Structure formats: C-alpha cells, structure tokens
C-alpha cells in the first residue's frame, strides 16, 4: 500500500519505465523518460486530487478519480455511501488501455484492511494482478510525499509474481486475503517473533 500521497506514484512511473527500457535496480540517468510508457493510470480519491495545485496537475497524468464510500475529508464516515458506477467503468476503460495502479487499502496507514471494492474489480474485470511491496517512503517523506523528512533511507519496490486467482470460484473474501498476503499487509505479518525462535 502507498505510504505517501504522491512520492510513491511518481517513483512507480520511474521504476516501470526504467525496467521497460532494460534497467535493473536503477533509475539513474533518466534517458528512459524520452520514450515513456504513457498508458499507466492510477486510482486516487477525488477529494485528494482536488486539494491543491499539484494534485490537480497530477490528475492530468493518468488519475482515475473515485469517490471513497467510507471516508470523507480525512475522516471515516458512519454511513457508507453507494459506489458510483462511473468510477468502476472508468477503471475498466483504463484496464482495457493499459496498466492500472491501485492502493487496495485506500490509506497511507499500514495494516488497514484491503477494501472489498478492489476484490470486486478484480473479480469483475479479471486483470492480471501484480503485487508490489513498498518500503521506505513513510520514513523518508511527509504524508503528502512532497517534503523529505530524513535522508539516507532506502526506498524500495519489490515487484512480485502475478497472483493466482480463480476468477470464477474465488470469493471476494478469498481475493482480499490473497491481496493482503501478497502486499504483506495481512494481520499475521504483525505478529512478533519471540527472541528464542530467532536464536534457534
């Protein structure tokens, strides 16, 4: 899941394009941006993308804005809103055209539940799902990802193998659990390993 609002997405564009141009573990010398992959889209909360000049500019760079049903103005809402069908249709159009980045927990906080809407989209549109584990951005940047808090911290993306999903038979709950394990955000990852087990 993302750790800042913007730094993660910008870094992903660099990593994907560097990798597509044959780079291995390096985004130095950004000549790969002369011919970038442009059909990369990302799902973002509509309220976030309207909250300032930079978000509005970034919205033109491939944002699929959606109305969150469980959160508004930075607070959880008690009465969940209905899903806007236009939002899921826009995601379908983007999937037909290229790659879609989504952060399935819908927040920058770690170990929050994966939203079932992500699983519904996976089950309905049957995309190839490639999990990515993000690390280091929360410690390096502020929440928005615009100001560096601490230097010398390694930021990383671990791109894993595509998930094995039975689109016909897997339940929404099973897909949610697969995603949680794949991005290392399942509650079991929070368990503290006793010192004696580490020593053995």
PLM regions: where:
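A cross-family acyltransferase "interaction/gating" segment
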Residues: 96-101, 106-174
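Conserved glycosyltransferase catalytic-site signature
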Residues: 9, 88, 115-119
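Short, highly charged C-terminal tails/helix-capping segments
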Residues: 193-200
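A short, hydrophobic secondary-structure junction motif
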Residues: 5, 37-56, 91-95, 99-102, ...
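Short amphipathic C-terminal alpha-helix that caps PH/PH-like domains
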Residues: 118, 175-186
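Catalytic core of membrane glycerolipid acyltransferases/transacylases, capturing the structured
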Residues: 1-78
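Short, amphipathic alpha-helical "lid/cap" segments that border enzyme active or binding sites
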Residues: 88, 92, 156, 172-180
């Amino acid at each position: 899941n993302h750790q800042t609002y913007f730094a993660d997405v910008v870094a992903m564009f660099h990593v994907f394009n560097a990798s597509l141009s044959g780079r291995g573990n390096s985004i130095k010398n950004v000549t790969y941006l002369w011919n970038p992959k442009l059909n990369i889209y990302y799902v973002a909360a509509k309220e976030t993308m309207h909250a300032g000049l930079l978000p509005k500019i970034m919205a033109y760079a491939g944002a699929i804005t959606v109305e969150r049903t469980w959160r508004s103005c930075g607070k959880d809402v008690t009465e969940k809103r209905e899903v806007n069908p236009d939002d899921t249709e826009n995601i379908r159009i983007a999937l037909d055209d290229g790659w879609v980045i989504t952060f399935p927990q819908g927040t920058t906080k770690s170990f929050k539940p994966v939203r079932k809407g992500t699983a519904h989209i996976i089950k309905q549109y049957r995309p190839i799902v490639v999990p990515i584990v993000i690390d280091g951005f929360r410690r390096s940047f502020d929440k928005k990802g615009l100001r560096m808090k601490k230097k010398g911290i390694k930021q990383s993306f671990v791109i894993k193998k595509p998930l094995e999903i039975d689109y016909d038979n897997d339940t929404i709950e099973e897909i949610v659990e697969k995603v949680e394990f794949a991005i290392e955000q399942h509650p079991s990852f929070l368990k503290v390993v006793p010192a004696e087990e580490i020593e053995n």
